[in-house]
Curated annotation (Swiss-Prot):
This is NADPH-dependent 7-cyano-7-deazaguanine reductase. It is found in: Cytoplasm. Belongs to the GTP cyclohydrolase I family. QueF type 1 subfamily. One of its GO terms (biological process) is queuosine biosynthetic process. Gene3D superfamilies: 3.30.1130.10. The keyword rRNA-binding does not apply. Keywords: Cytoplasm, NADP, Oxidoreductase, Queuosine biosynthesis. InterPro entries: GTP-CH-I_C/QueF, NADPH_dep_7-cyano-7-deazaG_red, QueF, QueF_type1. Its EC number is 1.7.1.13. Substrate binds at I62, E63, L64, H81, E82. It catalyses: 7-aminomethyl-7-carbaguanine + 2 NADP(+) = 7-cyano-7-deazaguanine + 2 NADPH + 3 H(+).
Length: 126
């Protein structure tokens, strides 16, 4: 097993590395993860997406290698577009407890269908 595969396989979301946020100002962190992959729970075919994460930290920020490894744990999981983005959103919201957070999954078209899933803490239903 290669070292990257080992790191992904052994990654434990419960022990995801987060750091204290020592900044006195409010600010937004924007992270783009252009190589997201999961497997369709129906067909098993791979689905690819770019994940856009934006959040206003309170007491914690995510360590960048930790978010990379966490995102890569979805690579061989059978999970829908909706479930994957909701899981990422809920995990980061629970771990970081940010003042505000938004997670967007912009999935590559498959079968002539393009899907964008968005979860955000300030969601207002029209």
């Amino acid at each position: 097993m290669r070292y990257g595969e080992k790191e992904i396989k052994e990654f434990d979301v419960e022990n995801m590395e987060i750091w204290p946020n020592d900044a006195k100002n409010d600010y937004i962190i924007k992270i783009t993860l252009p190589e997201f992959m999961c497997c369709c729970p129906r067909s098993g075919y791979p689905d690819f997406a770019t994940i856009y994460l934006e959040y206003m930290p309170d007491k914690f920020v995510i360590e960048l290698k930790a978010i990379k490894l966490y995102i890569n744990t979805f690579m061989y999981r059978n999970v829908s577009h909706e479930a994957s983005i909701n899981e990422i959103y809920n995990t980061l919201k629970d771990k970081l407890k940010p003042k505000w957070i938004k997670v967007v999954g912009d999935f590559n078209p498959r079968g002539n269908v393009h899907t964008v899933i968005e979860c955000r803490s300030d969601m207002v239903v029209p």
